[in-house]
């Protein structure tokens, strides 16, 4: 069995940054041993292995491959927006070794087993990282939920308002209550895009203000998120019996934090995530007409951004994800700069590690938020997100001393457009290892052969 080892004075293990050597099999793709302390080849612990190669990457840091649990790959059906090939290549270029694909924006959406089969066929031979899948909560598919669990989806996502694509309509309170019953005994999760406009509320603004970011922001106020989360919590509290865990995706409003905090304190199984763009960008920075910053919920104020950081450090927000939601430049309506008539989504898979490090986060915290907690959310905490024996040998070599500039031309996305264009960030991914195989180096780019696998085993 071919065995390699990689060592550094800086390895993120057991919630600390310390010297260690990782011994892994390139055949099984798993970690065999983690030897703490500076490596000495004469040590008994390492001489028991027939090491083929030992690589010392000091002073760079080794951390587990990131798990991005919120990615739209859009295949099949909207491959002009993204696809498995380009989306997963972008992931590994930034140290993301696992992504979980959202059920919408592909055609057909992942709302029944047949649609899921079509998606799995489309993914075959095109995955540069490992890929899991979410199923969809849409009207009339309650009978499809348990079959989808058995087919391998890791949970379900639904919208409480228009999703932006007609094939993925929103659900209401009655559906949520029924789905909680249907999935109560299943090993799964229910997730929600938590925005809920009031029935009489007009989201549109006068035509002349459509270029103004402030107009778009005011059209989707904090109350949308607060009202949606209140509805979801009301359904949970009304359920007289077991419920599956519930997750609020891409939380943008700090004003909703007290609701989550109180629900968790009362014992409700509720978690939430936020996104890199909500932590790294504030509304005050967004120029009028700059529709590449549009996302839903919207990026809010600087004080709101700071409030999200506080909630993340407190643990009320548990994880940070990309919500990679790309589209063609035409759908961003760049020439007109109309925020109301452009696609809402920010392309950013693979950019999160240096973005978070630039914000002053320790790598230990980044691993907690972007590896450990996301792997737990998707039911992969036994396999992904941790450097320990028995786990997949998904590893990232990160140069903390370097800086680089993010540019539209350098990203691997199909459409070279990101809100971070021109931003200088700290830290560079030098190498990404997926299950013991090098799949990316900063010097040579992505591997020629896709080595990613689908993750269809039951949650654990």
Swiss-Prot record:
Q: Which residues bind Zn(2+) 2?
A: 157, 193, 250
**Which PANTHER family does UniProt cross-reference here?**
ALLANTOINASE (PTHR43668:SF2)
Output a single Gene Ontology CC term carried by this record.
Answer: cytoplasm
Question: To which pathway does this protein belong?
Answer: Nitrogen metabolism; (S)-allantoin degradation; allantoate from (S)-allantoin: step 1/1
Q: Name one GO biological process term.
A: allantoin assimilation pathway
Q: Is Iron-sulfur one of the keywords?
A: no
Q: Which UniProt keywords apply?
A: Hydrolase, Metal-binding, Purine metabolism, Zinc
Question: Pfam families, alphabetically?
Answer: Amidohydro_1 (PF01979)
| Entry EC number(s) | 3.5.2.5
Which family does the record assign? Belongs to the metallo-dependent hydrolases superfamily. Allantoinase family.
**Subunit structure of this entry?**
Homotetramer.
State the superkingdom. Answer: Eukaryota
* Modification sites for N6-carboxylysine: 157
Catalytic reactions of this protein:
(S)-allantoin + H2O = allantoate + H(+)
Cofactors, names only? Zn(2+)
* Function description: Catalyzes the conversion of allantoin (5-ureidohydantoin) to allantoic acid by hydrolytic cleavage of the five-member hydantoin ring. Involved in the utilization of purines as secondary nitrogen sources, when primary sources are limiting.
CC cofactor note: Binds 2 Zn(2+) ions per subunit.
Binding, Zn(2+) 1: 70, 72, 157, 323
PROSITE patterns under this entry? DIHYDROOROTASE_1 (PS00482)
PTM note: Carboxylation allows a single lysine to coordinate two zinc ions.
How is this protein named in the record?
Allantoinase
